[in-house]
């Protein structure tokens, strides 16, 4: 520490290197106003000891307004203390001085690109991982031994087709990529012509580290809470008070998300698992940190005309640097549903862009409100000319059918049954599956609708995302009987008419779900989610380390079904206009007078012509 670094340029101590990168961040990553606000915020809250101004853990937590109920303060302080030492991990944990805290804000708000050449998201996520991890080669070696044993046990009867938690097992050359692990550090040192510092110990191998499960759980709870936050919105206004019920809700969702990392069988999260799960299922998990730490760059009600030490300065009316937020802003979620609430909405924003979700969702259909029928679904959803989110919740069906309807479902499916993704004795028997459908809903003819942005996902009891593949384009269907399969779903191709007729002429046709698919029957009573690890359908199989090689099929009884429209008031207004037009047309048809003088006879003639249906409602608008 403090030793000179050999280089052609004048030698710089480690302290000088740290100071230099902080100065460059200050000069190139912030506007003068932002830097002024940061200076003011730091001075206003800093403690002083031996002439050193710094921020304590208590100060940081109080400024960010971190809720005590989540117990996440120590985790955020650990992250800041590590990032404050950037680009010198050997100096961590750092005291949060002015320069250290400036580096923390620069990195967590992703403003370092103006100084460093390396700007990739994966590189940024690696620094986030480092800031959360503990380094213990003994723990890592123990993990690797367990994974190797698992791989041997699984490979014995099956050859080399599966590696269990292979994403965590060290593959060839993994230990040889240490330079790549430190790309952001290297970029920082290279920007100061101090690359030799890397050779003198400024490197840390992420493969000898692990994020403790408890710390990660607390952080995910906070990320669920702050997902909708704006840079100028305080956490106290976003969540003025955390009830016990809301805290329990956050903990439940955080545990679901952590199950994606396989923490049930591990003491923590390794880098390879972290990188795999984040990149495939939770790409926007850490987005909330950006606006949270941008709070350092906004000083409210600060009078720029006044300066310290200038008592002669005339008193002027205070002018805020940032205009105060609107008193009545659009709510994040206008009204919660039976499935969708603020916490589930935040979970969705971890893989769907929050700008399409927060303050943008409109409830279109609820089975328990509008009725569990294809007709009600069609009436409420089909006129929405923007993307939609379908959510279905239900309980696992018993292995042996207990009712006629359950038996009919079993008879409809192929005789070979894959195991469910959960065991019958699991504490959580409830599933939540869903889909993001970018296209407008319509009745399916000869082919499915939708495009490559269509996404299948699972929100409980684990978190998983199944993106569209290019192998097949059978994304979404809505089919009424006698079309096969009758119902709605995603990922299963529509059979040709000839195949459908020939198979159904003498007996009920067998429904063969796609390799990765979700199907709801036409009574909206049962749902089936199928996952075949080999893939080959319209959606890619799971990439989660714990389940990527597994086949399963979840059959469950639907308890709640919801569809939410993504879009603003303009889309909702278009839907209202369409509904009003259809009502007027239906009423006009009901009032048609054919001149017979007999109103009942008129209706019978209209029914025979197919213009109105037997329940006296208007006919279909096509």
Curated annotation (Swiss-Prot):
Domain TLDc: 338-567
GO-annotated cellular components: cytoplasm; nucleus
Region (Disordered): 146-179, 308-328
Keywords attached to this entry: Cytoplasm
Residue stretches spanning the membrane: none
InterPro entries tied to this protein: TLDc_dom
UniProt entry tagged with the keyword Transcription: no
Subcellular location field: Cytoplasm
Composition-biased stretches (Basic and acidic residues): 146-155
Chief localization: cytoplasm
Biased composition (Acidic residues): 169-179
Domain of life of the organism encoding this protein: Eukaryota
GO biological process: response to oxidative stress
Pfam families assigned to the protein according to its UniProt record, in alphabetical order: TLD
Keyword Cytoplasm: yes
Annotated disulfide bonds: none
UniProt function note: May be involved in a process influencing telomere capping.
PANTHER family xrefs: NUCLEOLAR PROTEIN 7/ESTROGEN RECEPTOR COACTIVATOR-RELATED, RESTRICTION OF TELOMERE CAPPING PROTEIN 5
Entry similarity comment: Belongs to the RTC5 family.
Protein name: Restriction of telomere capping protein 5
Organism the protein comes from: Pyrenophora teres f. teres (strain 0-1) (Barley net blotch fungus)
Encoding gene per record: rtc5
